[in-house]
């Protein structure tokens, strides 16, 4: 599946940014960092590489660099659907436009498109981990069977990604055998929902706190998570990142 052509689907809604201010900020960051943007035209028949030249907030438009040839430029102008994809800080950014028009920018030919009403942000789940806020701990209940008895072990999350979590086992009750899978683990993601997942132990780190207490930090991978689970996780990651960005910029 090509995300560029499918990002208008409802499945993308958990990852969609609709705030005009956030859309402008994202697109402006892409332009200021000179990130190349892939433009798909004619429903995937043609692709060109462009860049964001300017955001015109007064007219709600985005100015883009032209294609290298007149023929390709005309194909862009003739297209009734334009899809865009780029990467910003390991986050895939997707947006679209119904059409483009030609214009001049700093005495050079350019394209102008309407400011997108929304932008999709997709984390690269295999790389991106978000530390959970200390002010709103994320709980994870892990069913653990030992000697024929199943107990519910309460843990908290140190971090989370689209591929797994890092558990903090303060009482060191869980087995840390690499490859062991815990079924039906329940994670409560504040503001996003409850997920039930299978967690497989991938690594373990024993830590000694300043008070001398020893704890285990267990890195776990999601095993066959559902699309709904991944959507909920991504929704939570996006929420946390927005809150962190708001604090960093003094808006939170």
UniProtKB/Swiss-Prot annotation:
GO CC term, one of those recorded: bacterial-type flagellum basal body
One Pfam family here: PilZN
Protein origin, superkingdom: Bacteria
Protein's UniProt keywords contain Membrane: no
Chief localization: other
One Gene Ontology term from the biological process aspect of the record: regulation of bacterial-type flagellum-dependent cell motility by regulation of motor speed
The keyword Nucleotide-binding is annotated on this UniProt entry: yes
Keywords from the named record: Bacterial flagellum, c-di-GMP, Nucleotide-binding
Localization, UniProt: Bacterial flagellum basal body
Domain PilZ: 123-238
Any GO molecular function: cyclic-di-GMP binding
General function of this protein: Acts as a flagellar brake, regulating swimming and swarming in a bis-(3'-5') cyclic diguanylic acid (c-di-GMP)-dependent manner. Binds 1 c-di-GMP dimer per subunit. Increasing levels of c-di-GMP lead to decreased motility.
Protein family membership: Belongs to the YcgR family.
Subunit structure: Monomer. Interacts with the flagellar basal bodies.
The name this protein goes by in its record: Flagellar brake protein YcgR
Organism: Janthinobacterium sp. (strain Marseille)
């Amino acid at each position: 599946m090509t995300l560029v052509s499918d990002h208008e689907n409802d499945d993308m809604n958990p990852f969609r940014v609709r705030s005009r201010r956030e859309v402008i900020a994202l697109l402006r960051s892409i332009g200021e960092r000179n990130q190349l943007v892939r433009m798909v035209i004619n429903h995937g028949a043609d692709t060109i590489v462009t860049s964001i030249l300017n955001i015109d907030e007064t007219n709600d438009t985005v100015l883009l660099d032209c294609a290298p040839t007149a023929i390709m430029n005309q194909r862009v102008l003739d297209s009734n659907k334009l899809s865009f994809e780029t990467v910003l800080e390991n986050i895939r950014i997707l947006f679209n436009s119904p059409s483009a028009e030609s214009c001049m920018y700093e005495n050079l030919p350019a394209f102008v498109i309407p400011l997108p009403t929304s932008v999709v942000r997709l984390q690269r789940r295999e790389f991106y981990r978000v530390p959970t806020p200390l002010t709103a701990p994320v709980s994870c209940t892990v069913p653990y069977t030992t000697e024929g008895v199943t107990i519910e072990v309460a843990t908290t999350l140190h971090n989370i990604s689209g591929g797994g979590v890092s558990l903090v086992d303060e009482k060191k009750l869980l087995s840390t055998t690499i490859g062991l899978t815990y079924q039906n683990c329940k994670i409560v993601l504040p503001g996003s929902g409850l997920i039930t997942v299978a967690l497989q132990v991938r690594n373990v780190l024993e830590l000694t706190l300043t008070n001398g207490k020893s704890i285990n930090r267990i890195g776990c991978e999601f095993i066959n998570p559902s699309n709904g689970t991944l959507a909920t996780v991504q929704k939570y990651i996006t929420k946390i990142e927005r809150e962190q960005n708001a604090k960093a910029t003094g808006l939170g």
